[in-house]
Amino acid sequence: MDQSREAMAWYSHRSCPQAVASNLRRLVVDDYGPAMHAPERLTVYVDGFNLDHGLKERSGRRLLWLDLVKLSRLLRPRSSLLRVHYFTAPVLDDPPAASRQGRYQSALVARNPGLVEITQGRYQKKTRTCRACGASWIQYEEKETDVNIATALVADAASCATDAALIVSADSDLSPAIRTARSLNTTMFLAAAFPPMRYSAELSKLMPASFSIGMSKLTGAQLPRTVVDPASGRAYSRPAKWM
């Protein structure tokens, strides 16, 4: 979808009667002239598992040091960002990877005080066995991320906590939650931003707008090489393995 069509899709919901009524309640009057619309309040829901795997398939690890707040603002520059809700799970049985993950999350929060909320799911360890040769191996399955996203999205819709929801994922398991959110809050606008190498025909059909996140947005939204926490003074540097 080109930029103009994307913008039209994003804002076309304003013609809906319910959305117009909602927007009328949010008019802002300044000292210089007539009332103006307040910026649309936006919450971004990031499926960390879906995003990370797409980034790795597309470019290895070089884009993992990603500023999700900056990316959200690049994707929706006309909206007023309330928060980025990041859903992930702690790495198991790999201390170096767990250290890199923790460093990234700390840098992300330090760079964007008050704008990032992180919800942790879990990985479940399972033993798999080859029926043909009898060999066995350990496999890790990510659990709870889709449930956590669904819970947050539906809760925000029910409480009218946001005007618009941007879901960074191509996981079609989120479809029931999206339908529920839309039924609970008919004025809340929802859109899907598909990570690299990811696409869902079901979500694309279900959502008023959907698009793939372009490489220029991803490369333009990298965190600084070193992030310093303004509160503690602690520094978090980009892992060498992510260069």
Locate each region found by the language model:
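Intrinsically disordered, low-complexity regions enriched in Ser/Pro/Gly/Gln/His and often acidic
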Residues: 2-3, 38, 235
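Exposed, low-complexity/repetitive linear segments and helix-based recognition motifs
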Residues: 3, 27-28, 143
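Residue-level marker of intrinsically disordered, low-complexity segments enriched
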Residues: 6, 18, 26-27, 34, ...
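Domain-level signal for Mg2+-assisted phosphodiester chemistry and nucleotide/NA-binding surfaces
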Residues: 9-139, 189-191
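Nuclease catalytic cores that cleave nucleic-acid phosphodiester bonds
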Residues: 117-243
